[in-house]
């Protein structure tokens, strides 16, 4: 059994349902301390995090990831117990196998091999590990980044081990992510009996033309790396449940996924302008959960692309698709950041798994990237 597979199984066996770390981080720390890493355990609220660093000079390459996993769903529907890592028909099964305990294991064994070959390597290696990525993400990576930023400890290169591969491992690198801006819009009217329309103001009717305009607005055209910004409604709530009462207000929840071609402030201004033009009485609360970030082609993208080609025989595409990740926090202090990891076909699903044959090439990818950037 490879060292990476063995460590991945040890991690999967720990029931670290978010935000519980279940001892995963101490296991990782026990492998890093003998290599000369300094360890900062950073607990915020009920969340365990740590920052590890080996070296005091630049450039600093940081691996980032999370030990927490999502709940299993109906255990009886799993082919194997979700926290009993099982190798079957060439696949490693278990909750967190793809998202993202195999990546964590590959980080560690790649670093171990690199340090063994280059004990006096230039630059520094770091890790940011949290147990709060799958949950509310308020006491995890964002707080670690705030700690580093407060002392002006900046990152040159960062690799997040998210499962980015689509059809075969190595086919996709995330070199950026869209921003996420949510709104809670409450349009106010006058409640009353549905049989007396002259005595009421129906907020649903009033809001409808504005909703139509918002849904048809072209917010931007995107750019080379990002698709156009999208605006989508997720929920509409209005009414008392009775069929003879016009509601006094309607609540509309919506979300922007926006590119670097737009800013959160510009999008807010344009939404308010549309609502005001339709002469609505409304309240609007905003939540910015992540700004867009982008790493253009450069030394990090070149290094990891070459490593993937050597390890997997695949030429990766660059993509900014998908949801948000902790990369949105790290981008605030990182010069270059990418995400790369296993296939994402089974993440958050029953019978989550990775191919055993992909595990050592993943470790080799991370090791080759280290060698390209820190030799």
UniProtKB/Swiss-Prot annotation:
Entry note: cofactor: Binds 2 Zn(2+) or Co(2+) ions per subunit.
EC identifiers of the protein: 3.5.1.18
Superkingdom as given in the UniProt entry: Bacteria
Residues given in the record as Zn(2+) 2 binding sites: 99, 134, 348
Keywords assigned: Amino-acid biosynthesis, Cobalt, Diaminopimelate biosynthesis, Hydrolase, Lysine biosynthesis, Metal-binding, Zinc
InterPro entries assigned to the protein according to its UniProt record, in alphabetical order: Bact_exopeptidase_dim_dom (IPR036264), DapE_proteobac (IPR005941), Peptidase_M20 (IPR002933), Peptidase_M20_dimer (IPR011650), Peptidase_M20A (IPR050072)
Cofactor(s) of this protein: Zn(2+); Co(2+)
Catalytic activity: N-succinyl-(2S,6S)-2,6-diaminopimelate + H2O = (2S,6S)-2,6-diaminopimelate + succinate
Residues holding Zn(2+) 1: 66, 99, 162
Functional pathway: Amino-acid biosynthesis; L-lysine biosynthesis via DAP pathway; LL-2,6-diaminopimelate from (S)-tetrahydrodipicolinate (succinylase route): step 3/3
Known partners and oligomeric status: Homodimer.
Xref: HAMAP family: DapE
Family that this chain belongs to: Belongs to the peptidase M20A family. DapE subfamily.
Protein name: Succinyl-diaminopimelate desuccinylase
Annotated organism of origin: Methylobacillus flagellatus (strain ATCC 51484 / DSM 6875 / VKM B-1610 / KT)
Gene: dapE
């Amino acid at each position: 059994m490879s060292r990476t597979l063995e460590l991945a199984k040890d991690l999967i066996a720990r029931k670290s349902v978010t935000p519980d770390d279940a001892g995963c981080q101490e296991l990782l720390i026990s492998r890093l301390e003998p290599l000369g890493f300094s360890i900062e355990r950073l607990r915020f609220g009920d969340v365990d995090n740590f920052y590890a660093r080996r070296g005091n000079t630049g450039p600093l390459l940081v691996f980032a990831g999370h030990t927490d996993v999502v709940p299993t769903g109906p255990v009886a529907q799993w082919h194997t117990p979700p926290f009993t890592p099982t190798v079957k028909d060439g696949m490693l099964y278990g909750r967190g196998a793809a998202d993202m305990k195999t990546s964590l294991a590959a980080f560690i064994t790649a670093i171990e091999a690199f340090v063994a070959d280059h004990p006096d390597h230039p630059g520094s290696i770091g890790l940011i590990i949290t147990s709060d990525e799958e949950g509310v993400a308020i006491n995890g990576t964002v707080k670690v980044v705030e700690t580093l930023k407060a002392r002006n400890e900046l990152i040159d290169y960062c690799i997040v081990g998210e499962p980015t591969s689509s059809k075969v491992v190595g086919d996709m690198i995330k070199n950026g992510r869209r921003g996420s801006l949510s709104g809670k819009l409450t349009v106010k009217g006058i409640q009353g009996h549905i049989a007396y329309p002259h005595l009421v103001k129906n907020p649903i009717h009033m809001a409808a033309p504005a909703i139509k305009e918002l849904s048809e607005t072209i917010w931007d055209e995107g750019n080379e790396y990002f698709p156009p910004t999208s605006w989508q409604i997720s929920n509409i709530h209005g009414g008392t449940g009775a069929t003879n009462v016009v509601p006094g207000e309607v609540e509309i929840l919506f979300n922007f996924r926006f590119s670097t071609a737009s800013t959160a402030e510009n999008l807010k201004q344009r939404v308010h302008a549309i609502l005001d033009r339709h002469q609505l009485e409304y309240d609007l609360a905003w939540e910015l959960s992540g700004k867009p970030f982008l790493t253009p082609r450069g030394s990090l993208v070149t290094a990891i692309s070459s490593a993937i080609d050597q390890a997997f025989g695949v030429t990766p595409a660059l993509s900014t698709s998908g949801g948000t990740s902790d990369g949105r926090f790290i981008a605030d202090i990182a010069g270059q950041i990418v995400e790369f990891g296993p296939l994402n076909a089974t993440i958050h699903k029953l019978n989550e798994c990775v191919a055993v044959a992909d595990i050592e090439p993943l470790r080799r990818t991370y090791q080759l990237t280290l060698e390209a950037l820190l030799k």
